[in-house]
Amino acid sequence: MRFMTLLFLTALAGALVCAYDPEAASAPGSGNPCHEASAAQKENAGEDPGLARQAPKPRKQRSSLLEKGLDGAKKAVGGLGKLGKDAVEDLESVGKGAVHDVKDVLDSVL
């Protein structure tokens, strides 16, 4: 669960950096999709314009990644809420059992 949260935050930070300033996001060849997309567009500048239109749009990719990350975060938060409720119920049941055990011990002693 922590890994998914860190993954989501990393993806969100990367998307924000790319959206803010793609040239400052990374150096060439570092594997950053924002930089690679802009480099591919520069390489295709002298080619047929129809070929340049076939490149995927990074904004759609980023928005789908953000949506997936948000869905994952919502599921993680929902899971934490359920886990907390289960823990409280377990503690209450253990507490009730312990109270009855103490009463039984006191009754037997007195």
From Swiss-Prot:
Zn(2+) 2 binds at D86, D90. Residues 24-70 are annotated as: Disordered. Residues 50-62, 110 form a propeptide. Glycans are attached at S30, S38. GO terms for molecular function: lipid binding; metal ion binding; monoatomic ion channel activity; peptidase activity; RNA binding. The chain crosses the membrane at residues 64-108. It is found in: Secreted. It holds the Pfam family Dermcidin. This is Dermcidin. It comes from Homo sapiens (Human). The gene is DCD.
